[in-house]
Regions:
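PLP-dependent amino-acid enzyme catalytic core
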Residues: 1-143
Length: 145
């Protein structure tokens, strides 16, 4: 399959038929691991950013803030990079160095909170930073694990 950009490839992963002796139904599986970021989270990350753009909340050159410790942060970092946004990821210090390095490779600024603060502290800091005008929080549920 040919795509003009990484963004265009998100979600356009192959579907394969899974054989089943127990059912006469056709069972299909979508290979979301073949997204450019290697995760099913690539699709919702793109949707979150596009929704913010389409609603007019996210302006060209804006800064995103996200409290996350998982694949959503990696996917958001990738999509933000593709679309030219800055992104600040806030997460507990217990997150693996591999996750941190992956997000940094996409250009994310990483802020670590203590393990005692955990995701609640990350969420609170994200909201405080948004209140201070340092960027916008995409998802009000905030916690992505």
């Amino acid at each position: 399959m040919y795509f003009k950009s990484i963004q265009d490839s998100i979600g356009n992963t192959a579907m394969i038929q899974i054989p089943s002796e127990a059912s006469s139904s056709i069972i299909l599986a979508k290979l979301e691991g073949n997204n450019p970021g290697g995760s099913v989270k690539d699709r919702p990350a793109l949707k979150m950013i596009e929704d913010a753009e389409n609603s007019g909340v996210l302006k060209k050159g804006g800064t995103l803030i996200e409290a996350t410790s998982g694949n959503t942060g990696i996917a958001l970092s990738m999509v933000a990079s593709i679309k030219g946004y800055k992104i600040i990821i806030i997460m507990p210090e217990t997150v693996s160095i591999e996750r941190i390095k992956t997000m940094e490779a996409y250009g994310a600024k990483i802020i670590l909170v203590s393990k005692e603060e955990d995701m609640e502290g990350a969420r609170d800091l994200a909201m405080q930073m948004q209140s201070n005008g340092e960027g916008m929080v995409l998802d009000l549920s905030l916690i992505h694990i």
